[in-house]
Amino acid sequence: MSYYGSYYRGLGYGCGGFGGLGYGYGCGCGSFRRLGYGCGFGGNGYGYCRPSCYGGYGFSILLKSYPEDTISEVIRRSFNLTKY
């Protein structure tokens, strides 16, 4: 199963992937109408983020072949960094 960890200003997600193609999305950065999402391709552990929020930033990491503790650490840091 793929794992997706991301954070945006205001809101952060840590989601499990779907099947072999892991993907997820996060919304935040000022309002719920402003979305950012990240996709990952199963097998190579690559992820990217396209934040559409103005004045903000975000990143996404798709972890497929990394240990569980690394995944939980990324997700934990994500929520800590976006705590308001």
Curated annotation (Swiss-Prot):
GO terms for cellular component: cytosol; intermediate filament. InterPro entries: KRTAP_type8/19/20/21/22, KRTAP_type_19. Keywords: Keratin, Repeat. The keyword Repeat applies. Transmembrane segments: none annotated. It holds the Pfam family KRTAP. PANTHER family: KERATIN-ASSOCIATED PROTEIN 19-3-RELATED, KERATIN-ASSOCIATED PROTEIN 19-4-RELATED. Belongs to the KRTAP type 19 family. In the hair cortex, hair keratin intermediate filaments are embedded in an interfilamentous matrix, consisting of hair keratin-associated proteins (KRTAP), which are essential for the formation of a rigid and resistant hair shaft through their extensive disulfide bond cross-linking with abundant cysteine residues of hair keratins. The matrix proteins include the high-sulfur and high-glycine-tyrosine keratins. Interacts with hair keratins. This is Keratin-associated protein 19-4.
